[in-house]
Amino acid sequence: MKNIKSILLGFVLGTIATGIVVWNVMPGMMLEERLSPYSVDETVNKIKENAISKGWAVPSVKPLHKSILKHGGGKVEPVMLVNLCQPNHAFNILSEDDNKKISVFMPCTISVFQKSDGKTYIGNMNAGLLGSMFGGTVAEVMAEVSVEQQAFIEFAN
């Protein structure tokens, strides 16, 4: 009986420890950040050019910092949201009814922002990891998206 309690306690503690590690590590794996050698505007333009050259559309570039200020939130350093869409990838995911909820992650967004140090940074979601959480078609498509998006921002590596 004592051995069973010890095994059960070890299992529970191991599960809790694993949960704590995953909880603390996942944000760093899901969201990526890198320093850009260019200004905010130059970085946005490079990303747009690279995406378009690879068959992606750029539906919009939104100056989030201006919207925050306009609506009374105060002044923050520049934050630009570059919205990107590859129509075939979007179709392959959204043509399946069970995947329509994935539309909350669309269009793909790369952020370009300036921190208080005056430097420009690029932020993006790890599309491959996101896709693997859903499996199936979403995982297949998002694996491709991940590779393609890295090519848009390779100048900052």
Located regions from the model:
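A mature extracytoplasmic/lumenal domain signature
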Residues: I47, K62, Q86-N88, S116, ...
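C-terminal partner/receptor-binding element of secreted or periplasmic proteins
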Residues: A127-N157
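Short secondary-structure transition/capping segments
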Residues: K101-Q114, I153-N157
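Compact, glycine-rich, soluble single-domain proteins
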Residues: K54-P59, L64-C108
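Beta-strand/loop substructures that line and gate deep hydrophobic ligand-binding cavities in soluble
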Residues: T109-G135
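N-terminal hydrophobic targeting signals that begin at the initiator methionine
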Residues: M1-K2
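Hydrophobic membrane-insertion alpha-helices, especially the h-region
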Residues: S6-N24
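Terminal, regulation- and interaction-focused segments at domain boundaries
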Residues: G19-K62, S67
